[in-house]
Amino acid sequence: MVPKQKTHSGAKKRFKLTGSGSVSRARAGMRHNFEHRSSRVTRRLTGRQFVSDADSKLARKLLGK
């Protein structure tokens, strides 16, 4: 019997699987140093983004789906 595939720890912290099956991610650059960025940039980086079709297959594999 083949052992079960483990979920990638880094991937489960970074990606979420939506109900429709697409993979969402947060935008980079939203951890600290906001005083050096304009409010416009900060607003643009909020919210979630979808992983591209080329990368979503790999992301799903890392999530064990």
From Swiss-Prot:
Gene Ontology terms, MF aspect: structural constituent of ribosome
Annotated keywords: Ribonucleoprotein, Ribosomal protein
One of the protein's GO biological processes: translation
Pfam families (UniProt xref): Ribosomal_L35p
Phosphoprotein among keywords: no
GO CC, any one term: cytosolic large ribosomal subunit
UniProt keyword annotation of Cytoplasm present: no
Residues of the signal peptide: none
Cysteine disulfide partners in this protein: none
InterPro entries: Ribosomal_bL35, Ribosomal_bL35-like, Ribosomal_bL35_CS, Ribosomal_bL35_sf
HAMAP family named among the record's database cross-references: Ribosomal_bL35
Family: Belongs to the bacterial ribosomal protein bL35 family.
Entry protein name: Large ribosomal subunit protein bL35
